[in-house]
A protein has these predicted regions:
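Helix-coil boundary and interhelical linker segments in multi-pass alpha-helical membrane proteins
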Residues: 24-40, 79-99, 141-160, 206-211
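Hydrophobic, membrane-facing alpha-helical anchors
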Residues: 46-56, 106-118, 159-177
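Hydrophobic, membrane-inserted alpha-helices
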Residues: 20-24, 79-80, 195-203
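Interhelical loop and helix-boundary elements at the membrane-water interface
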Residues: 1-19, 54-74, 113-134, 177-191, ...
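C-terminal membrane-associated helical module and adjoining short loops/tails
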Residues: 124-240
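Topogenic membrane-insertion module of multi-pass membrane proteins
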Residues: 1-49, 227-228
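Alpha-helical transmembrane segments of polytopic integral membrane proteins
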Residues: 23-26, 43, 47, 81, ...
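Multi-pass membrane catalytic core of lipid/isoprenoid biosynthesis enzymes
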Residues: 9-16, 57-112, 142
Length: 240
């Protein structure tokens, strides 16, 4: 059966949907519609996961697609979340808050540039540093908490955001090995358990969306911290 000529455009179309979601997040951030801004970044992450998966399934990977994906990631997970956090919280820190936002954006750009030139085939189960969608999820932790509590922004939020944004920026450009599930191969038994776990997660997301999102983000943050501590422990043990 002949392949439809439009099939090759499907992965890039999904990437463009991620880009549109990221730009929409910027619009909602400017309008101070924080929940929609966060949801647009989450939607961008959803599309970002599936564009690569679809490209591999259809065997339609291309240099053009890779460059478009990086541009989309920079806007959706570099520029959009940094602007969101600055407009919502860290603007209260004045110039320092703006510098931290710029630092995160620059780190996202550097990570994506490095990702493009490195041979990622050697990293089937490990990322070096944290990917930009995960970094965006981490720096939005205070927003998830605020949505749950339904409280007014407190003086602690800007400081927490500044620390998380700086940490996420550093981790994006670091050489710290962190787990990756994109290309993880699992045995049949573990695959079934993974499917059950995902189903349970979806149930909790439907019932307790922001609470579940917060727990997942905190869990990833703790894993990243553990990876960083393990990296330093291994490094100092080698040099001592």
């Amino acid at each position: 059966m002949a392949e439809h000529p439009l099939t090759k455009f499907i992965p890039n179309l999904i990437t463009l949907m991620s880009l549109i979601a990221g730009i929409s997040s910027i619009k909602f951030s400017i309008q101070a519609n924080w929940k929609l801004a966060v949801l647009m970044i989450m939607l961008a992450a959803f599309f970002d996961f599936f564009d690569g998966w679809m490209a591999r399934k259809l065997k339609k990977s291309s240099q053009f697609g890779a460059e478009l994906d990086s541009l989309s990631d920079f806007i959706s997970f570099g520029l959009a979340p940094s602007l969101l956090i600055n407009l919502c919280f860290t603007h209260e820190l004045g110039r320092i808050g703006w510098v931290i936002s710029l630092f995160y954006i620059v780190c996202a750009a550097l990570r994506l540039a490095r990702f493009n030139i490195e041979n990622m085939k050697e990293q089937s189960k490990v990322f070096y540093g944290i990917p930009s969608p995960a970094a965006a999820g981490v720096i939005m932790i205070p927003l998830y908490l605020n949505f749950i509590d339904q409280v007014q922004f407190t003086i602690n939020y800007p400081l927490i955001c500044a620390v998380l944004t700086t940490f996420a920026g550093i981790m994006m450009i670091s050489r710290v090995p962190t787990p990756s599930v994109k290309n993880l191969k699992v045995k049949t038994l573990y695959f079934r358990l993974m499917i059950i776990s995902v189903a349970i997660l979806l149930i909790f997301l439907i019932s307790y969306f922001w609470q579940t999102t917060l727990l997942v983000a905190i869990a990833y943050l703790l894993i990243s911290l553990l990876s960083l501590l393990t990296y330093f422990f291994t490094f100092f043990r080698r040099v001592s």
